[in-house]
Amino acid sequence: MSKKLTFQEIILTLQQFWNDKGCMLMQAYDNEKGAGTMSPYTFLRAIGPEPWNAAYVEPSRRPADGRYGENPNRLYQHHQFQVVMKPSPSNIQELYLESLEKLGINPLEHDIRFVEDNWENPSTGSAGLGWEVWLDGMEITQFTYFQQVGGLATQPVTSEVTYGLERLASYIQEVDSVYDIEWSPGVKYGEIFLQPEYEHSKYSFEISDQVMLLENFEKFEKEASRALEEGLVHPAYDYVLKCSHTFNLLDARGAVSVTERAGYIARIRNLARLVAKTFVAERRKLGYPLLDEATRVELLKEETE
């Protein structure tokens, strides 16, 4: 690697690459979430028959992973670059390796391994065949073929590529701490995110109001159900995301027991499944508008027979 790309140049390079491969460039979704997979641009669009190709950066919050800014690689919030393609291209792995070349990483000169790591997200009823991608001994990407999302089988199969941007940037810039990553010329990652990391960690582990969070979970759960009763998928899913983040805050605070934890996850999963089922039903009412006309007519005909 000759030129060491800044963090924002890595994002720009990936955006340009996947744009050229036919992906829409979406923007980060404005609700807290633990992973890019939970964005409606993946969770909802991975189900149903309509094609969908999108790429976006997603800040991902994981309260239990906060370390007050003292750990060089573990963060309350990190950034993922998410690529989702449906139906999955037959050459998706080759496209991924090509994207690494655009970042200055020649696959022929590095030890790049696809290590089997089947993926599951119990809180959304989602699972798939997956691999971790290791670059010279460090995991930089999660690669998944979705089999189930929101409790529904995915057909056609959706492929997901999730780059861990901090890890990728640490490797490209040859730094040991994420806080030393150059975000833009002359500006370090730590100058932007070290204080928020400390403050969010302190809040998550020490300050958050457990009673308020428990009450909020109940309110968000009820509101999600109420929205679903009206067939309002997207507002309902917003409240599912709020339930998920609230649960993660409770979990980080140690406010839920092992038994209670399983119960909360099941409650979120039940809502997510209802959202998924309702979304597909609503898209069908619209006549699956993203399908080409011939496929759309044939599919609607089959479903009415």
UniProtKB/Swiss-Prot annotation:
* Gene3D superfamilies in alphabetical order: Bira Bifunctional Protein, Domain 2, Class II aaRS and biotin synthetases, domain 2
**Catalytic reaction list:** tRNA(Gly) + glycine + ATP = glycyl-tRNA(Gly) + AMP + diphosphate
Disulfide-linked positions: none
Instruction: Identify one Gene Ontology CC term for this UniProt entry.
Output: cytosol
Pfam families, per the entry = tRNA-synt_2e
Biological process terms in GO annotation: glycyl-tRNA aminoacylation
Q: Which UniProt keywords apply?
A: Aminoacyl-tRNA synthetase, ATP-binding, Cytoplasm, Ligase, Nucleotide-binding, Protein biosynthesis
Q: Per the annotation, which location comes first and is thus the protein's main one?
A: cytoplasm
Record-listed E.C. numbers: 6.1.1.14
Q: Where in the cell is it found?
A: Cytoplasm
Enumerate the InterPro entries for this protein: aa-tRNA-synth_II/BPL/LPL (IPR045864), Gly-tRNA-synth_heterodimer (IPR006194), Gly-tRNA_ligase_asu (IPR002310)
Q: In the record, what terms sit under GO molecular function?
A: ATP binding; catalytic activity, acting on a protein; glycine-tRNA ligase activity; transferase activity
Family, similarity comment: Belongs to the class-II aminoacyl-tRNA synthetase family.
- Entry-linked PANTHER family: GLYCINE--TRNA LIGASE, CHLOROPLASTIC_MITOCHONDRIAL 2, GLYCYL-TRNA SYNTHETASE
Q: How does it assemble?
A: Tetramer of two alpha and two beta subunits.
In Swiss-Prot or TrEMBL terms, this protein is called: Glycine--tRNA ligase alpha subunit
